[in-house]
Regions:
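Interface amphipathic segments
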Residues: 1-63, 71-78, 82-170, 177-301
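A short, hydrophobic C-terminal helix/tail in secreted or cell-surface proteins
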Residues: 302-306
Length: 306
């Protein structure tokens, strides 16, 4: 039985698959398929990403050979990312991916110092592999390394949860099944970091003294219209434990509301432990020492009584 398939996007052929299925009397059929990708657009995957949490751009090229039994096929070949980027508007981050080929050898996707850039010249590199030999339970074993990496360099927008500049050193490992990864390592926040976090669910409420009497709202003024709940990015079943060193010169600011009129500013350092659980809980445990003081800016602040 022969197979011939192709995929067009905007009237342009972007994927071709040719091959044959070889049935046997034992029922353990085998196959031989060659697939070619030519400028396969990754943005078509954006429709499957909920709430546009991240946006893919760029093309994928490459050739794949699929052989062996239909129950346990072997995949070999290479994939080339052509100007591929991943944008997260909430976190103001745009990651640019290496254009060097990524090899697929016997169902292993191999990363050889695969580089990811943002706005700086220093890359974030990945070494290791993702193993698909057991299709029901793909496994990963990856080493992550970055030195003086520009993790964030973004201005504030209406969608921002984090903005400012973050520079970091990172050395970490990621291992385990893709639906339950374990990440361990060290993160060093460098002294030129100046970052702000927008607190969307705050127990502190900023309130005008006349707010309980009358409120005038102009629907053409987008700053006074009720803001829709901002979707958050989930990291799936990731179990992360990172030892963090924060340089004493690091500046961290927390916007207590979307107006940017009420904020807390911290300057200091420490060595806390950062944990992220598979349930989505993020905690920091340890000592943080103020070196440049604490600044609180607000109009009228109401604290909860319970």
């Amino acid at each position: 039985q022969y197979l011939n398939a192709y995929l067009n996007h905007d009237k342009v052929e972007v994927l071709v698959a040719d091959g044959k299925l070889l049935p046997t009397s034992t029922g353990k059929d085998s196959l031989e398929v060659n697939t070619t990708l030519e400028h396969f657009p990754l943005h078509i995957a954006n429709v499957f990403i909920p709430d546009e949490l991240v946006t893919l751009a760029g093309d994928m090229d490459g050739e794949l050979s699929i052989t062996g039994s239909t129950e346990q096929p072997l995949i070999n070949g290479e994939l080339i990312l052509d100007s591929v980027s991943v944008l997260s508007r909430q976190y103001g981050a745009n990651f640019l991916f290496d254009n060097r080929p990524v090899q697929l050898k016997n169902n292993r996707l191999i990363f050889d110092k695969f580089a990811i850039y943002t706005t700086g010249k220093n890359p974030f590199t990945i070494d290791g592999y993702v193993d698909f030999r057991d299709m029901s339970r793909p496994m990963a074993s990856l080493n992550l390394l970055a030195e003086n990496y520009t993790l964030l360099n973004a201005k504030r927008t209406r969608e921002s949860l984090v903005y400012g500049k973050v520079f970091a050193d990172l050395r970490a490992t990621i291992k385990g099944p893709l639906d339950g990864l374990n990440m361990r390592g060290n993160l060093n926040l460098l002294g030129n970091t100046d970052v702000s976090y927008v607190l969307t669910d705050s127990p502190l409420t900023v309130q005008d003294r006349l707010g309980s009497l009358v409120t005038f709202t102009s629907f053409s003024d987008t700053t006074t219209v009720v803001r829709q709940e901002v979707p958050t990015v989930s990291l799936g079943g990731l179990d992360m434990v990172m030892m963090v060193h924060i340089d004493p010169s690091v500046r961290v600011k927390v916007d207590l509301d979307a107006s940017n009129d009420n904020r807390v500013e911290l300057e200091g350092g420490g060595d806390p432990s950062m944990k992220y659980t598979p349930q989505g809980d993020l905690t920091l445990t340890g000592r943080y020492t103020l070196s440049g003081g604490l600044t609180v800016s607000y109009t009228h602040l109401t604290l909860p009584t319970t």
